[in-house]
Amino acid sequence: MNTLQLTKKQDYTIVQLNRGKVNAINQEMVQELRRTFQELHNDPDVKGVILSGQPHYFSAGLDLIELIQYNETQIHDFFAEFGTLYQEITQFSKPFISAITGHSPAGGCVLAVTSDNRYMAAGDKYVIGLNEVAVNIQISQNLTEAYAFWMGGGLANRYILEGKLLSGNEAVSAGLVDALLPLEHVLGHAELKLQQYLKADQEIWINTKKKLRKHWLNKLDQNPKNSLKEAAALWWKPEIRAKMEAYVDSFTNKKKK
């Protein structure tokens, strides 16, 4: 695989996002994540999964530099597949923990909110959040339900409309993140929590997770093309397109310096 690195342990697998320094999400990463989680779901020897990133970046979100070059069909296909990935890992029944090794805005947060626990690297420079409104990407109804599940409807409503990125301390206070740890301890702490879960009877644990998520899952639009059709359509709105192109130009110019 080109965007992921798998580490197999005795009873679980660590899936590390491994696409450059910032793990920007593109079509290939989405496809590899879908395929990997399907295989891990079907593998009886895998009892749980940890999703981790690179040092300082869990994922910087969508790869706008690549996506801005997609044509209309490619954009619709991308959002449909990204929406499908979100639904599939939200419904992943085995223990699933995110080791957030740094920044996790927008698309990075989309991946993280599907997991059962989130442990994040401590540090003032690291942020997490569904800041789609602030970067002119239409958030889906399915994503708003995830935020509300973890932090409650009122706080989720406020933070989504503000396009707010949360510091680690804010994320813990809101219930979005379980704990902050030194960067070098994040993965190890996630493994300890997963090992705790694996001591329980697997069938009972999985049944309990399904019961806890029942109301959340019942609210999901099961048609990924429908859930993100607004995002795909608004991608081509001239004012939004101009802002995205300006952002991409400014970012690529910084990289050249």
Which stretches of residues belong to each language-model region?
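Conserved CoA-thioester-binding segment of acyl-CoA-metabolizing enzymes
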Residues: M1-S52, Q87
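Catalytic-core regions built around general acid/base machinery
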Residues: T36, E81-S93
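Glycine- (often His-adjacent) and acidic-residue-rich active-site loop
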Residues: D45, S52-L85
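Glycine-rich beta-to-alpha transition loops that act as phosphate-gripper elements at the mouths
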Residues: A99-P105, I160-L165
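CoA-thioester-processing core
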Residues: P105-Y159, H189-K193
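Well-ordered beta-strand positions
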Residues: N117-Y119, R158, E162-K164, E170, ...
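C-terminal long alpha-helix characteristic of the crotonase
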Residues: M120-Y126, V177-K225, S250-K257
